[in-house]
Curated annotation (Swiss-Prot):
InterPro entries assigned to the protein according to its UniProt record, in alphabetical order: 7TM_chemorcpt
Localization (cell): Cell membrane
Function text: Probable gustatory receptor which mediates acceptance or avoidance behavior, depending on its substrates.
A GO MF label: taste receptor activity
Gene name per UniProt: Gr22d
Taxon lineage: Eukaryota, Metazoa, Ecdysozoa, Arthropoda, Hexapoda
Organism: Drosophila melanogaster (Fruit fly)
Residues on Extracellular side: 65-82, 164-184, 274-281, 385-387
Keywords: Cell membrane, Membrane, Receptor, Transducer, Transmembrane, Transmembrane helix
Protein name per its UniProtKB record: Putative gustatory receptor 22d
Length: 387
């Protein structure tokens, strides 16, 4: 998956994946060393210590700079105009810092399990899927879109710094915020990259099952041992996914809540800035705020999309297996293998039920989007007299 392939799109995907890997190492959020001889990852206590030091230093700097700004009375005009917005922003700042600490600590705490999961995926890639040169468009598309979203998200603090007329934040503050944001985005991305890699493997299994159906319809013989082997691979993927979801359950819920809350606050910020202060420039009104909101929702929607994609691909496996029912005079061993595969798929599915609270798919993503709009309306109605 990290091998450069021919074609501009594949090379672009390779560059993005490498950039994610090295950025994660530099920020200390990927505490694994690669052993070329064994072709596996090994957890490093030095990298864990390095990650704790880097993450703690950035968070302490960010909190310290925020406290110094309050001591010196540095406050945006919009906060002076609307006390509710200032209180909500302060509360979100505290919640954000606590959430980021929780995300980092839980990820490091589960790093031993993550080592097992990543090595399992790498082993499957090297032994069973390495020789398959078929490109997966959905995999490439997700990596490219996610890379663009992260780059645009990193530009947002700098756009605020240079685009806001009353911005008084030092460049060092903006740099620290950007680094903290990059680390948080990459931590969330590690989970979704694992999901999309599992999707790619399931997609390849479905492709081979379809090829077997076409071969049997052409009066060619099929191998029951190959079907049992595909079932074995499918079982490994389901187990790896279950472990991956268990490791990232809490982090994913926190990240989704933070991004949805951030979008609500940014929209309310734009309303207050435009109505109360009446000095929003063309750049701020049509570029900066809409771009920040669109980027956050795009990031949120990509997370929903990749989870929904894996679930649909898992359901497609069951649908493909049903196609074997139309084939007459099928070998008895092959028929038993297909039945076992279908029975397994009906009992073991790819389900995204984070912390037992809600399922993650496009329908739930749309409901969350509608809920965000309603919360924004409630907020405007509550503080209508101060606008």
């Amino acid at each position: 998956m990290f091998r450069p392939r021919c074609g501009l799109r594949q090379k672009f995907v390779y560059v993005i994946l490498k950039s994610i890997l090295y950025s994660s190492w530099l920020l200390g959020i990927f505490p694994f060393k690669y052993e070329p001889k064994k072709r596996r990852l090994r957890r490093s206590m030095w990298l864990i210590l390095f990650g704790v030091v880097i993450s703690s230093s950035l968070l302490i700097l960010m909190v310290k700079q925020s406290a110094e700004d309050r001591e010196h009375g540095i406050m945006l005009d919009v906060f002076q105009r609307n006390a509710l917005l200032y209180q909500i922003s302060s509360l979100m700042g505290v919640v954000g810092v606590v959430s980021i600490c929780t995300v980092h600590l839980r990820t490091l705490w589960r790093s031993k399990h993550l080592e097992e999961i990543y090595n399992g995926l790498m082993l499957l890639e090297a032994k069973y899927f390495c020789s398959n040169a078929v490109e997966c468009p959905a995999f490439d598309g997700y990596v490219i879109q996610k890379g663009v979203v992260i780059v645009v998200g990193l530009l947002a603090p700098w756009m605020v710094h240079f685009g806001m007329p009353d911005s008084k934040l030092p460049v060092l503050n903006v740099l620290v915020v950007s680094m903290v944001k990059l680390g948080t985005l990459l931590l969330a991305l590690h989970y979704h990259l694992g999901v999309v890699i599992i999707y790619r493997f399931v997609w390849l299994i479905n492709r081979e099952l379809l090829s077997l159906v076409c071969s049997l319809r052409g009066n060619h013989k099929g191998s029951s041992s190959r079907v049992r082997f595909l079932l074995k691979l499918y079982n490994k993927l389901v187990n790896l996914y279950s472990k991956l979801a268990d490791c990232y359950d809490c982090q994913t819920v926190l990240m989704m809540a933070i991004f949805l809350a951030a979008n609500i606050i940014v929209c309310f910020y734009m309303i207050v800035y435009r109505i109360s202060l009446s000095k929003m420039s063309f750049f701020v009104m049509l570029i900066m705020f809409p771009l920040a909101i669109a980027n956050n929702f795009m990031d949120f929607w990509l997370s929903m999309k990749v989870c929904d994609l894996l679930q649909k691909t898992g359901r497609q496996t069951s649908m493909i297996l049903k196609l074997f029912n139309d084939i007459e005079n099928m070998d008895k061993d092959l028929e038993i293998s297909i039945s076992d595969f279908a029975l397994y798929c009906s009992h073991r599915r790819f389900k995204f039920l984070h912390c037992g609270l809600f399922h993650v798919n496009r329908e739930m993503g749309f409901k969350m989007f509608v809920a965000s709009v309603l919360y924004l309306l409630y907020l405007v109605q509550f503080d209508y007299m101060n606008l």
